[in-house]
């Protein structure tokens, strides 16, 4: 009887594993398999718990993003209504607050930091009200004026650093995306080539649209010279890279898009629109019947919602209009590429294609200091947009704090580094020097 049961067990093992070597299996091996069975059954629970924690972490990040968008709007209100001094005082107070919470986290006082995070929305609104009401009176105070002036000078002198970091981060992201496209085609399926060509055509179309929009602005002679030089350089480098096999269409189109973006931002931030050059008839974006239906739907929703909530929505929409679209676009692009670099560099060090999303209790320096960096970057962009000519008597300080000059310097250095990398890379290489640590095998 035992022999029959044992033979049946062997038959089951053979049918499951499909290996004749298991015919010589003894009872000790079967006991080991039985002992490991509960561990295998417990893995789905662990996976569910891990996915649940990741979902909660992503939800928390979305809440943090929404809260920071509110801060962006409030800082724009401070600069628009209260003026330069009011905006500087508010951003300096926010910088001190976020830096204090970062120090609390670094020194292990996370409970106090979490308590401050819980009251962040209330504290931000209180700081805005205090800055709007008290800025006219404290502007005459020499200590407050000195702090605001020092904060303004520090932000303006960070302009070269922010622009150069943006250029280097953009180059690394472009090369990582180009390498990822090659990896998908070589290791997954050649059908990915269709999506790569589609993305490249979209990038080129967006670049041409941005350059077309530039024609509505008056362009100075130095800017016209830099536009022609940068566009000619990126076209020559892209043709050389694609023809030699050292770059692909994805990289070439993204580099062209980066130069077109730089040209557009320089002209929109520092150029005067020439409205007489383009006179276009105004058309409705949607047919009249659809517009009427949408208007009726919005009227119904506004009548249903409480009046207070409706007023809050109107206030937020009106406040969001105080933020210039070019400032918001530049801020979103700069933060996106810098954040992408924080995900790409660990992936390069670990020789993997991408870094899995995770948020542990022991946060890194980037996640702790990110609010301080975001406030500094955004305030720097606002100062560049609202006050493009820094009030410095020294020519050296004017050059150091000129965003227009450093945008061009960043673009030219990025193209130069990309050209050097293409020139010294081998034709058989499927990755670039900056991304050569990725594995294709």
Swiss-Prot record:
<feature type="transmembrane region" description="Helical">
    <location>
        <begin position="192"/>
        <end position="212"/>
    </location>
</feature>
<feature type="transmembrane region" description="Helical">
    <location>
        <begin position="154"/>
        <end position="174"/>
    </location>
</feature>
<dbReference type="InterPro" id="IPR013635">
    <property type="entry name" value="Ice2"/>
</dbReference>
<keyword id="KW-0812">Transmembrane</keyword>
<feature type="transmembrane region" description="Helical">
    <location>
        <begin position="335"/>
        <end position="355"/>
    </location>
</feature>
<feature type="transmembrane region" description="Helical">
    <location>
        <begin position="363"/>
        <end position="383"/>
    </location>
</feature>
<dbReference type="GO" id="GO:0006642">
    <property type="term" value="P:triglyceride mobilization"/>
</dbReference>
<feature type="transmembrane region" description="Helical">
    <location>
        <begin position="88"/>
        <end position="108"/>
    </location>
</feature>
<dbReference type="Pfam" id="PF08426">
    <property type="entry name" value="ICE2"/>
</dbReference>
<feature type="transmembrane region" description="Helical">
    <location>
        <begin position="224"/>
        <end position="244"/>
    </location>
</feature>
<keyword id="KW-0472">Membrane</keyword>
<dbReference type="GO" id="GO:0000921">
    <property type="term" value="P:septin ring assembly"/>
</dbReference>
<feature type="transmembrane region" description="Helical">
    <location>
        <begin position="112"/>
        <end position="132"/>
    </location>
</feature>
<feature type="transmembrane region" description="Helical">
    <location>
        <begin position="399"/>
        <end position="419"/>
    </location>
</feature>
<feature type="transmembrane region" description="Helical">
    <location>
        <begin position="247"/>
        <end position="267"/>
    </location>
</feature>
<feature type="transmembrane region" description="Helical">
    <location>
        <begin position="312"/>
        <end position="332"/>
    </location>
</feature>
<dbReference type="GO" id="GO:0032541">
    <property type="term" value="C:cortical endoplasmic reticulum"/>
</dbReference>
<dbReference type="GO" id="GO:0005783">
    <property type="term" value="C:endoplasmic reticulum"/>
</dbReference>
<dbReference type="GO" id="GO:0090158">
    <property type="term" value="P:endoplasmic reticulum membrane organization"/>
</dbReference>
<protein>
    <recommendedName>
        <fullName>Uncharacterized protein C23C11.01</fullName>
    </recommendedName>
</protein>
<keyword id="KW-1133">Transmembrane helix</keyword>
<dbReference type="GO" id="GO:0097038">
    <property type="term" value="C:perinuclear endoplasmic reticulum"/>
</dbReference>
<feature type="transmembrane region" description="Helical">
    <location>
        <begin position="62"/>
        <end position="82"/>
    </location>
</feature>
<dbReference type="GO" id="GO:0005789">
    <property type="term" value="C:endoplasmic reticulum membrane"/>
</dbReference>
């Amino acid at each position: 009887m035992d022999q029959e049961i044992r033979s049946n067990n062997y038959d089951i093992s053979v049918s499951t594993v499909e290996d004749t070597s298991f015919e010589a299996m003894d009872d000790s091996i079967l006991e080991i398999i039985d002992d490991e069975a509960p561990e295998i059954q417990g893995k789905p629970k662990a996976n569910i718990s891990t996915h649940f924690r990741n979902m909660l972490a992503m939800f928390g990040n979305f809440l943090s993003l929404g809260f920071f968008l509110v801060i962006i709007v409030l800082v724009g209100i401070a600069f628009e209504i209260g003026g330069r001094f009011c905006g500087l005082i508010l951003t300096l107070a926010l910088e001190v607050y976020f830096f204090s919470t970062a120090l609390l986290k670094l020194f292990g006082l996370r409970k106090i930091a979490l308590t401050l995070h819980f009251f962040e929305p209330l504290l931000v609104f209180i700081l805005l009200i205090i800055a709007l009401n008290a800025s006219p009176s404290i502007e005459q105070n020499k200590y407050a004026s000195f702090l605001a002036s020092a904060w303004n000078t520090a932000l303006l002198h960070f302009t070269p650093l922010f622009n150069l970091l943006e250029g280097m981060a953009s180059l690394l992201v472009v090369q990582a995306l180009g390498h990822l496209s090659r990896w998908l085609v070589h290791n997954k399926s050649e059908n990915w080539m269709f999506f790569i060509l589609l993305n490249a055509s979209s990038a080129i179309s967006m670049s041409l649209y941005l350059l077309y929009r530039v024609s509505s602005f008056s362009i100075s002679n130095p800017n016209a010279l830099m536009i022609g030089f940068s566009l000619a350089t990126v076209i020559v480098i892209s043709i050389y890279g694609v023809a030699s096999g050292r770059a692909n269409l994805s990289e070439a189109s993204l580099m062209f898009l980066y130069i077109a973006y730089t040209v557009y931002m320089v002209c929109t931030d520092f150029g005067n629109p020439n409205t007489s050059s383009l006179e276009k008839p105004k058309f409705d974006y949607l047919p009249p019947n659809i517009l009427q239906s949408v208007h009726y739907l919005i009227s119904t929703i506004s009548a249903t919602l409480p009046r207070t909530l409706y007023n809050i929505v109107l206030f937020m929409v009106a406040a969001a209009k105080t933020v210039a679209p070019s400032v918001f676009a530049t801020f979103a692009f700069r933060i996106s590429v810098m954040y992408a670099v924080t995900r790409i560099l660990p992936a390069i060090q670990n020789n993997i294609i991408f870094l899995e999303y995770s948020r542990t209790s022991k946060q890194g320096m980037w996640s702790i200091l990110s609010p301080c960096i975001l406030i500094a970057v955004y305030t720097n962009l606002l100062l560049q947009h609202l006050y493009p000519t820094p009030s410095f008597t020294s020519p050296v300080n004017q050059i150091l704090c000129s965003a227009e000059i450093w945008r061009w310097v960043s673009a030219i250095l990025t193209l130069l580094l990309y050209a050097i990398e293409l020139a010294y890379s081998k034709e058989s290489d499927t990755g670039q020097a900056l991304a050569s640590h990725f594995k294709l095998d």
